[in-house]
């Protein structure tokens, strides 16, 4: 039906929704809501510099910040109805919790009209302070930088609604304050063999405060925090070299990075437990290493050839721990379960890439370019939940089903072909440029852009038995042949 462009499936029948609302006696059956995030970020920064001598400069300073995000639902359009009652509609038919429907016990049965807040209302706040010191050394051929940043952060939640499922301080008012000590250590050194040849090496170690939303199992209406949160640790090193010449400019980089103690949270429906759940994944570890190179070759005065390529390995290097709580009462579904993530590839980033582009810069501001790209060794983003004993162990009762839960799907290699035509108009102190860009010239409609594993599990009942298998991966696709016209003015 979707491929046939049946409007009953490709479009929303607004007239039918309004008709249903008008038959409900004023109470909305359907409505449009906005999920609002209001940001209020304040920062103070003081920086100073002292020249110790002609080659050494010391830079130091202090910074303060306060980041506050207020999140709530707001009624946009009641679609012809008069009001809606502020209750949790997911619990209306629940045999156990069907009598705990109020989204805000302090205003039970509240009537919501267009423009009113409802559902949830909370704020996440981060307060931080940091001291920094940097030393810059410069000579004719040698340069070196050393920097240290030491900070202190505090993260908390404040609920403005008292959820009936989680009365009192479980949802209303301030949560406990989680404190972290982030830091960053960086060192870099470079040597210029000549004005056209340069090499640099850099290394860094850091601890980063987790994202505020990842520190709570369900920040919409629950003050429950992740157990024993710690900063995410990062270690990285990079080697860069650059060569420039009258015909060819070349640069290459070799890199390695490792992150440890990552935290991720999400809400989902657990098919094995038959309940909505909140999940926290802790101890996530990743490793990235590889090399990349790029070259610009001036074929003639008007022709430029650009080449680039990269090869790397991006993978999970540790088995994280998974804790799952019921979304309705915080009861434990699975606690500190080991997920077999070690050795899985990181999704989203191709491990092999190549690009070639040729450009022509003609007279009177005319120009065109064409490019071809390749992305290979791509994988869907793996889900830690599927690789726990509760899912893969209990659900994968045969080797075939166990492999289906734990095997990571590889995406097909992707190729792109693009082109652009542009014209520039120069004025006395400004420039106007018009560009026509054509993306995906071949018109491929089935090029996979990215994907991730589903958290859902399907039941298979051959006779009296019940088997479990994972749902198929969710994939997004690149745009088909597309045309873009841009006009820019610089002055």
For each predicted feature, which ranges?
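C-terminal beta-barrel architecture of Gram-negative outer-membrane proteins
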Residues: 347-426, 450-451
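Repeated loop/turn-to-beta-strand initiation elements of outer-membrane beta-barrel proteins
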Residues: 55-58, 141-146, 196-199, 247-250, ...
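Surface-exposed extracellular loop regions of Gram-negative outer-membrane beta-barrel proteins
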Residues: 107, 154-166, 177, 191-237, ...
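Signature of Gram-negative outer-membrane beta-barrel scaffolds
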Residues: 31, 59-194, 321
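Outer-membrane beta-barrel domain signature, strongest for Gram-negative TonB-dependent receptors
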Residues: 1-68, 73, 249-251
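Transmembrane beta-strands of outer-membrane beta-barrel pores
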Residues: 64-70, 139-141, 150-156, 203-209, ...
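Gram-negative outer-membrane beta-barrel transporters
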Residues: 138-141, 256-258, 277-386, 488-490
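C-terminal beta-signal and adjacent terminal beta-strands/loops
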Residues: 305, 374-394, 423-491
């Amino acid at each position: 039906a979707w491929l046939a462009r049946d409007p009953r499936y490709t479009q929303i029948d607004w007239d039918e929704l309004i008709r249903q609302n008008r038959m409900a006696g004023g109470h909305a059956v359907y409505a449009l809501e906005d999920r609002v995030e209001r940001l209020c970020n304040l920062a103070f920064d003081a920086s100073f510099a002292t020249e110790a001598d002609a080659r050494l400069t010391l830079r130091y300073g202090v910074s303060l910040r306060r980041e506050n995000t207020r999140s709530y639902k707001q009624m946009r359009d009641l679609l012809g109805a008069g009001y809606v009652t502020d209750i949790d509609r997911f619990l209306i038919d629940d045999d156990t919790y069907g009598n705990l429907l109020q989204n805000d016990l302090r205003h039970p049965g509240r009537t919501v009209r267009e423009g009113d807040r409802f559902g949830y209302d909370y704020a996440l706040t981060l307060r931080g302070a940091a001291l920094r010191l940097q030393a810059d050394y410069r000579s004719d051929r040698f340069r070196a930088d050393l920097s240290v940043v030491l900070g202190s952060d505090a993260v908390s939640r404040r609920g403005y609604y008292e959820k009936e499922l989680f009365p009192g301080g479980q949802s209303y008012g301030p949560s406990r304050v989680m404190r972290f000590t982030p830091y960053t250590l960086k060192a870099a050194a470079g040597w210029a063999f000549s004005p056209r040849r340069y090499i640099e090496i850099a290394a860094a170690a850091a601890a980063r405060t987790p994202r505020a939303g990842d520190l709570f199992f369900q920040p919409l209406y629950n003050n429950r925090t992740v157990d024993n949160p710690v900063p995410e640790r990062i270690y990285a090193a990079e080697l860069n070299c650059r060569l420039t010449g009258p015909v060819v400019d070349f640069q290459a980089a070799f890199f390695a990075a490792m992150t440890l103690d990552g935290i991720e949270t999400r809400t989902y429906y657990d098919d094995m437990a038959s309940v909505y759940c909140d999940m926290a994944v802790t101890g996530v570890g990743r490793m990235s290493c590889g090399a990349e190179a790029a070259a610009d070759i001036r074929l003639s005065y008007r022709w430029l050839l650009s080449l680039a390529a990269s090869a790397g390995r991006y993978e999970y290097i540790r088995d994280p721990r998974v804790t799952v709580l019921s979304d309705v009462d915080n009861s434990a579904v699975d606690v500190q379960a080991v997920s077999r993530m070690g050795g899985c590839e990181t999704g989203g980033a191709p491990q092999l890439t190549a690009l070639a582009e040729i450009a022509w810069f003609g007279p009177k501001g005319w120009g065109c370019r064409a490019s071809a790209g390749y992305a290979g060794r791509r994988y869907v983003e793996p889900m830690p939940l599927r690789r726990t004993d509760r899912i893969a162990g209990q659900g994968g009762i045969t080797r075939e089903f166990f492999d289906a839960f734990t095997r990571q799907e590889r995406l097909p290699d992707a190729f792109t072909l693009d082109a652009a035509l542009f014209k520039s108009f120069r004025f006395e102190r400004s420039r106007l440029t018009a560009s026509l860009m054509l993306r995906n010239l071949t018109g491929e409609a089935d090029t996979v852009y990215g994907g991730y594993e589903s958290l859902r599990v399907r039941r298979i009942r051959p006779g009296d038995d019940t088997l479990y298998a994972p749902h198929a991966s969710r994939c997004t696709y690149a745009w088909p042949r597309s045309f873009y016209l841009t006009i820019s003015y610089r002055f």
